Amino acid sequence: WGNPYCDPFHDILVHPRIVPYLNTILGQGFRMDHTPGLITMEEDGEGHTFHGSAGPGFDPNCYYIYKNGEIHCGLTVVAWQFSDTNPGDGGLCVIPGSHKGNFACPAAMKKYEQYQEFVKQITCKAGDAVIFTEALTHGTLPWKAKHQRRSLLYRYTAGNLAYVSGYETWATSFADLT
């Protein structure tokens, strides 16, 4: 999208409320990694399989370390919510504490077939931002609300890391961000 339609997306890219958190967990000089993801779901939209955490296919760029009283993360997501998510609506869900695990998540849990009591749906209001590490096992529950789910995902990493290999071709609307 060209100007002025892209301006709100630019404004929240390094929103002053999230920058201190990203500086703390990623370090000064963090950078955007991946192109943004704009998610919309209508009522009865299907969910998305859980991913992240340890186990087969583990990516060392998706790490979580706590050492000497400080948290350090690799690839980190800021999920801006543009619509309310109430209990039972579906949407973003996580397995709390899984970012600290050293063992693979059971396949039945990743498919939401078993152990559902360990899954937490994230509730929030429009305008909220949810920050989490890609090391956390997360996914999407089917959308049950009458209103549309709207969420924007920005992914960041430490300035010296690159999760996406090589360079992506960015949309022209991002040209003025450099």
Language-model regions, residue ranges each:
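Non-heme Fe(II)-dependent double-stranded beta-helix
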Residues: 1-67
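Short edge-strand/loop segments of extracellular domains
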Residues: 40-42, 95-101, 149, 155-161
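Short, surface-exposed loop/helix-turn segments at secondary-structure junctions
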Residues: 51-63, 107-118, 148, 167-173
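Residues that flank catalytic or metal-binding motifs in active/ligand-binding sites
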Residues: 5, 33-34, 46, 74, ...
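Non-heme Fe(II)/2-oxoglutarate
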Residues: 109, 129, 136-178
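Histidine-centered catalytic micro-motifs
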Residues: 48-55, 95, 137-140, 154
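A structural signal for short, well-ordered beta-strand segments
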Residues: 35-37, 78-80, 152-156
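Double-stranded beta-helix
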Residues: 71-141, 161
